[in-house]
Regions:
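Electropositive, beta-rich accessory/interaction domains or terminal extensions
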Residues: 1-122, 167-178
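Acidic and generally charged, gly/proline-rich low-complexity regions
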Residues: 115, 159-160
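A structural micro-motif recognizing beta-strand termini
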Residues: 91-94, 147-151
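Glycine-rich active-site loops that engage anionic ligands at enzyme catalytic sites
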Residues: 100-150
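Structural motif
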Residues: 102, 152-159
Length: 178
């Protein structure tokens, strides 16, 4: 069982960071309470401002809270959840151990690792850490995406359970492709 610290959703809003012009983003996500329907495109109340930030193969963004430690010297206080705009903040799920095609149960749903996550400049702008995107990319600690195999309800207290491993003769980890 993989502990889920938070399942978060966001609404599109206009954000202003530093010298950047105002932008549309749903980067500021907050944990939902109770249960929510997860369909092929993601959590029904979650929004994405840009086409490449969602879709069938990027329905859920996942990031390990243990990876927040990469930035402990850059920030006065690390966030408790959704630091990088992820939907699932898990306690620890290392990109080297996460394989494309791995399937997990989350509540009533089945989700499958489907894509790498390429860090966005908006995260760098939010935290005013000049090398944040480069640091994430070079570390291989970028998070990843799930597609939804089986739709259903997810409760705020649900955890992830690995139910099917990717085929061993062809599997690639998220870290392999980062």
């Amino acid at each position: 069982m993989i502990k889920v610290n938070a399942i978060s959703i966001g609404k599109i809003e206009t954000l202003s960071y530093g010298n950047y012009k105002p932008m549309q983003s749903a980067l500021n996500k907050i944990p939902f309470k109770g249960q929510m329907w997860l369909n092929r495109l993601g959590f029904v109340d979650d929004e994405q401002a840009y086409h490449n930030h969602g879709g069938i193969h990027k329905a859920i963004c996942c990031f390990s809270k243990s990876n927040y430690q990469l930035f402990k010297d850059d920030l006065d206080q690390l966030p408790e959840f959704a630091m990088f705009g992820e939907n699932l903040t898990v306690e620890h799920l290392d990109e080297a151990d996460v394989y494309f095609g791995n399937q997990y149960q989350l509540g009533d749903t089945i989700i499958e690792v489907s894509d790498i996550r390429e860090p966005c400049w908006k995260i760098q702008a939010k935290y005013a850490i000049p090398n944040l995107v480069q640091k994430m990319s070079q570390s291989g600690k970028t998070g990843f995406y799930f597609r939804v195999i089986k739709e259903g309800y997810v409760h705020q207290s649900d955890n992830l359970k690995l139910i099917k491993k990717a085929e061993s003769n062809t599997r690639l980890s998220v870290k392999d492709l980062n």
